[in-house]
């Protein structure tokens, strides 16, 4: 019988996966009370900094602290490169799809997607019809939600193009991990993410036909 979930840290025989071994040794050597204390410190620091989130659909707008998990999601570089290429390919396809919908609508004419499914959708913007965008770049940012089945195969749960939230939480969570657990980063080669704001700026600039446009993020 196939496994109903994928254990990121241990394989089916209960053996620690190679890319988690260093972390497993650190975790085994760290007293539980020390982990609990650092978790409380993280909650306090997030609270003081006002780093919270609101659940969609919550009419009261109740703000909640970011759930801080000391167990990291560790992905080997070779595995991540495959995921990265797949995400890039997917976002390119989605931009081509949007460019077609707002221009020739070949995908509708070919009967692949019913016209009413697009034209009657509340997110369809009739004012965008026929409007040419520089480099046909409709989605500058994509929040691709990934899941894994019991065998460890990655699947895309959904593509968040309209409201791709979560990047700021990722950046703040990494800062918190580096502040509370610097020894983990000293022992392993962890890919940096602090250059994300520069990547975002470059992406937004590239969507303009001007050489050096002003960029405002609302």
Predicted regions mapped to residue ranges:
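Preference for protein termini
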Residues: 1-218
């Amino acid at each position: 019988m196939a496994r109903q979930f994928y254990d990121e840290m241990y394989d089916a025989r209960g053996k620690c996966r190679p890319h988690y071994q260093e972390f497993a040794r650190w975790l085994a050597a760290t007293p539980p009370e020390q982990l609990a204390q650092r978790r409380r410190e993280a909650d306090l620091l997030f609270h003081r900094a006002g780093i919270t989130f609101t659940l969609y659909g919550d009419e009261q707008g109740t703000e909640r602290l970011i759930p801080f998990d000391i167990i990291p999601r560790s992905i080997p570089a070779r595995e991540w490169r495959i995921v990265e290429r797949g995400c890039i390919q997917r976002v390119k396809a989605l931009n081509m799809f949007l460019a077609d919908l707002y221009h020739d609508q070949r995908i509708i004419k070919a009967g692949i997607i019913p016209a009413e499914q697009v034209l009657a959708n509340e997110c369809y913007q009739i004012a965008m019809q026929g409007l040419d965008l520089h480099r046909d770049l409709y989605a500058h940012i994509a929040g691709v939600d990934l899941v894994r089945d019991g065998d460890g195969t990655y699947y895309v749960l959904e593509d968040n193009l309209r409201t791709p939230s979560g990047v700021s939480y990722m950046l703040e969570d990494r800062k918190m991990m580096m502040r509370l657990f610097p020894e983990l980063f000293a022992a392993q080669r962890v890919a940096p993410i602090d250059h994300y704001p520069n990547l975002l700026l470059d992406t937004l600039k590239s969507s303009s036909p001007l050489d050096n446009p002003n960029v405002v993020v609302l």
